[in-house]
Regions:
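RecA-like P-loop NTPase motor core
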Residues: 1-86, 93
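Activity-critical C-terminal alpha-helical subdomain
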Residues: 87-198
Length: 199
């Protein structure tokens, strides 16, 4: 079975892939399954395959929060609709960062981007979507939206810093680094102008 994770950016894709390799036994795979040789075409996109036993996983950086729909329609939709021997991706996970937005707003935005192929998305809940393939057969695809972090606004980097900070020794290092970056930010504004870069 093939699995698919769509995420916002290259850093997210790299971190997710690394995490899955270290915690769940996935390994980099150079050869994609037949008919799924999907290549990123834009500078801010990325496509990497992983393998674990007979399962394959493709993690794609779509190039930003507003590009889920465009990336899906350009690269993913055609192989799904034209599949003659099963479903290439029966389950798709969408990983996005909360940043400074509300969860309901993100669910609505992602659903609008992927409409009409997906009828809805809900944070941390599998949703079944029905569609007709190019042969007129009714099929189903399940989607899971994962908004990171759930507890507060922020990005994947916030989750990593929170996890590192669970150890008192490492928390001290994180706190000192955060204070250092905050102190130099006025002078280094040209290099760390956004809150995201300050993380």
């Amino acid at each position: 079975m093939n699995r698919l994770i769509l995420c916002e950016g290259k850093t997210d894709a790299i971190l997710l892939g690394y995490y899955l390799m270290k915690t769940d036994g996935w390994a980099l795979e150079k050869k994609p399954p037949s008919g799924l040789d999907i290549k990123a075409q834009e500078r801010n996109e990325n496509v990497v395959w992983y393998k674990k036993g007979n399962e394959k996983l493709m993690i794609c950086a779509v190039g930003g929060i507003d590009n889920f729909g465009q990336f899906f329609s350009r690269y993913i939709q055609r192989p799904i609709l034209n599949a003659s021997n099963g479903d290439p991706f029966p389950r798709i996970a969408l990983v996005t960062e909360r940043d400074d937005r509300d969860i309901v707003e993100i669910e609505r935005d992602v659903t609008e981007q992927l409409s009409p192929f997906f009828v809805g998305t809900k944070n941390r809940e599998w949703i079944t979507n029905n569609y007709l393939d190019s042969f007129g057969m009714e099929k189903q695809i399940e989607t899971l939206l994962i908004i990171i972090p759930v507890e507060h606004q922020g990005a994947l980097e916030n989750v990593m810093l929170d996890a590192i900070s669970e150890d008192p020794y490492d928390k001290n290092i994180v706190d000192k680094c955060t204070a250092f970056v905050a102190a130099i930010r006025p002078e280094a504004n040209r290099y760390i102008a956004t809150d995201r870069l300050q993380l």
